[in-house]
A protein has these predicted regions:
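Membrane-embedded helix bundles of polyisoprenyl
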Residues: 97, 143-262, 266, 271-283, ...
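Membrane-proximal helix-loop-helix interfaces that form the catalytic/acceptor-binding platform
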Residues: 284-306
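Start-transfer (signal-anchor) and selected internal transmembrane alpha helices
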Residues: 1-62, 68-72, 367-375
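Transmembrane alpha-helix segments characteristic
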Residues: 274, 302-328, 341-344
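Extracytoplasmic
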Residues: 72, 87, 361-565
């Protein structure tokens, strides 16, 4: 009887202890989620304020607002406008699938070719929610992008939090992300670009994968992470045409995890798309390790001075290394690499387990957990105190973005050019022309389409050393009515020889001579963009200047050649 009472008493005590632990865990999770959402919302508000102050967005007219969509990104916003202007969503979608009003002489499926699914979803939500009664279309579109950026930083917060066990690491990751904003995102100047829509989904996928790879999660949490991973991966593939390259790198990271037995095979086979590749890799790497004298021990523990019990950490090590290598080769990859460097660095600063492992590696005594906690808070507050004034100062001292020459050009096209006119020029400028005037163009800023790339190369011959007749034939083959020559390309100055557009054209056309290590361009014809401004024959036989300002010269391609001498 006495033993039974003692047993019941102990069970009650342990039950109370477990209940208290569970309550504390729920409280920590609640405040961590609250902090993550707060960081995301604050970042979205910051981006909105920064964007408005940089472009004076709220005080501009519609034309000047649309010109702020740079790097050819305005083309995507044009299709969003088109969907809203259509009588119905179904009709607008059908018109985009048989679009013959964008690229001259071609009928394209714009939805598939340009991955317009974000614009379709945004226009559908704008219609069904009745948002047209209280918000302008452009603000709804911009707000959707900023909302996704909030999701982006929230996912980074969660990644660092899951690995380190403290949401202080998440706050530090977000702080460093904002501080390095110029290297983490292009949302400042090219809102509609596909990567601004796609990378938040990839960030959510990485956060879900981080949780999925963790060993200390329940089966319900594991299933939630798996479903989140599947949904975000599908969306990522749908939105961005280059997403499969990123997922391939991610597959390599998982391949290495499985090859070195750092994660249960069940998880990798569930998570990885290329599970057959991973299985082959295991059969190759494992025997090689044994042949080199390595024991087949897989149950690594922190007590052994290893972090094998945290496969999510090893995954992020591989992730950071692979994307870092690509960032060294391609500058554009820094937008994929830097955010995860910020996140992983925050984890490294705030993870007590990692510090214990490092100290065991170097044969030093472990530090007290309270000391680690103090160090984390010092790092966070030092970062905030040092960089917060600079970040806030960016909102108060921004030069006004104003492009009067482009505004003048678009105004002339709207008022003077025929409705059915076809324009040729650089892809980025043509995207702006398409957005602001709706005119047909000869090419688009889409660099995965070989046909469009060939059209762009033919149009760029206006900056090469080609005859007037050659350029005329190339332009008329594209049904061009007007060609726009940009001073920034024609008179481009660069310290790197051979990297300008006109240098590349000279090399492609065989108009280059090498002499004692120096590169010289040579042709029996002068550079077209210079010669045509002289306004003499034979250039005036084929082209007639109809508009010019400091930045642009617009020439009409004569339908009837008039020979003047």
């Amino acid at each position: 009887m006495t033993c039974s009472l003692v047993f019941i008493k102990k069970r009650k005590i342990w039950g109370a202890i477990f209940k208290k632990i569970r309550t504390n865990r729920l409280v920590r999770v609640f405040f961590g989620c609250l902090a993550a959402v707060a960081c995301g919302m604050l970042y979205a508000v910051y981006l909105s304020t920064y964007h408005d102050r940089k472009f004076w967005f709220s005080t501009k007219q519609e034309l000047e607002r649309e010109i702020t969509f740079q790097e050819g990104s305005g083309l995507y916003y044009y299709y969003y406008k088109h969907m809203l202007a259509a009588p119905s969503f179904e009709r607008g979608f059908y018109e985009l699938t048989i679009d013959n009003k964008t690229v001259s002489g071609q009928t394209i499926n714009a939805v598939e070719r340009l991955s317009l699914y974000p614009e379709l979803i945004a226009s559908f939500v704008y219609r069904v929610t009745g948002s047209q009664d209280f918000v302008e279309p452009v603000y709804f579109y911009v707000g959707a992008v900023f909302g996704l950026q909030a999701v982006y930083v929230t996912a980074l917060f969660v990644c660092s939090w899951v690995m380190s066990g403290t949401w202080v690491a998440g706050m530090l990751a977000v702080a460093w992300y904002v501080i390095n904003r110029s290297d983490t995102t292009k949302v400042d100047h090219a809102l509609p670009l596909r990567d601004n829509w796609a990378l938040p989904y990839f960030s959510c996928q990485v956060a879900a994968l981080t949780g999925f790879l963790s060993n200390n999660i329940s089966s319900a949490t594991e299933m939630f992470c798996y479903l989140t991973m599947s949904a975000t991966t599908f969306t990522f593939l749908l939105v961005w045409e280059h997403s499969h390259y990123i997922l391939f790198i991610q597959g390599l990271c998982l391949f290495l995890l499985d090859s070195f037995d750092l994660v249960p095979p069940r998880k990798v086979k569930t998570a990885a798309v290329g599970s057959h590749l991973i299985s082959v890799g295991r059969h190759v790497v494992t025997p090689a390790s044994v042949a080199l004298g390595q024991p087949m021990k897989t149950d690594h523990r922190l007590e052994d001075g290893q972090i094998g019990e945290q496969p999510e950490v090893i995954y992020h090590v591989f992730h950071t290394l692979f994307f870092g290598g690509l960032a060294l080769l391609f500058e554009g990859m820094k937008y994929l690499w830097t955010p995860y460097v910020c996140m992983f660095t925050a984890f490294g600063v705030c993870c007590p387990g990692l510090w214990m492992t490092v100290f065991k590696w170097v044969k030093l005594k472990s530090i007290h957990p309270v000391t680690t906690l103090i160090y984390m808070y010092i790092s966070l507050f030092t970062t905030l105190l040092q960089y917060c004034p600079r970040v806030l100062a960016e909102l108060s001292d921004l030069p006004e973005f104003y492009d009067p020459d482009t505004v003048e050009l678009i105004s002339w096209i709207r008022s003077q050019a025929p409705v059915a006119a076809v324009f040729a020029g650089s892809p980025h400028l043509l995207a702006t022309i398409k957005l602001c005037s709706g005119a047909a163009v000869t090419s688009l800023p889409l660099y995965s389409d070989v046909n469009l790339l060939k059209r762009t190369e033919d149009t760029y011959q206006v900056y090469a050393m080609r005859s007037a007749e050659d350029v005329y034939k190339l332009l008329t083959s594209q049904k061009t009515n007007y060609v726009i020559i940009e001073e920034s390309i024609c008179n481009e100055l660069s310290f790197n020889k051979g990297c300008r557009i006109k240098d590349l054209l000279d090399i492609s056309n065989g108009h280059v001579v090498y002499d004692k290590g120096e590169i010289y361009s040579f042709s029996k014809h002068g550079r077209f963009c210079h010669e045509i401004k002289m306004n003499y024959s034979p250039y005036t036989n084929y082209f007639t200047r109809v508009f010019w300002n400091r930045s642009y010269h617009v020439y009409k391609v004569n339908s009837v050649i008039s020979f003047q001498y």
